[in-house]
Amino acid sequence: MTNSIRLFVGCASLILVLALYGGAAAGPLDPGYPKAFSCSACHGFAGASGADTVPVLAGMQSWYLKKAIQDYASGKRPSPEMESYSKMVLELGVDDVAGYFARQKRQPSPVRLDSAAVERGRAASTQCVVCHGAQGKGDPAKGIPDLTGQPPGYLKNQMLLFKADRRSPGDETLKALKALMRTIPDEAFGDLAAYYSSLR
């Protein structure tokens, strides 16, 4: 995507948002909303699309969202589609976009979960809690994100990508996580995903 096209998309998004909300009396417009508008096609206007394989952005930590955008834009986290959008977000203002989604009310995934899978995942999560905590909330000080309420399909896909070293390949900070993923059979990832998706 060329710079001129990115600029056009950003300006068009801003014009549309102002047209929709300019006459509203609900308070000042969040400065990040116009810049995050292009994300809404996949992630929803409030950062929660309801799709099983698309992550919930609403209420996620801003530091994590910012890092994810930067990693996608640089190619460190491979995804051709996300790379182009993330580069545009960097130009528009990554702090505003990450802050906007972080300020939205957390909306856990509505995907229906199998209760038996949740319980199996709970039993299998003993090694995960070392880093992500007993409630799955992570540790911002160590760069560990909150897993709770994410769509199970998304969580399962990410675990499989880590196991195959296809997410952030070569990243030494994720070496221990990837080693752990390789000890887990593929069929167990669905259970772990269901468990963490069930947490609030």
What are these regions (language model features)?
Residues K35, T53, Q61, A68, ...:
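Stable alpha-helical elements in mature extracytoplasmic
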Residues E119-N157:
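Conserved small-residue-rich
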Residues M1-A12:
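Bacterial N-terminal signal peptides that target proteins for export
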Residues C39-A46, V97, G121, T126-A134, ...:
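The canonical Cys-X-X-Cys-His
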Residues G50-V56, Y72-K105, S109-D114, A141-D146, ...:
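Axial heme c-ligation environment in periplasmic c-type cytochrome domains
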Residues L29, P34-S74:
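The feature marks the first
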Residues V17-A36, A48-T53, A102-S125, G143:
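Electrostatic cytochrome c docking/interface patches
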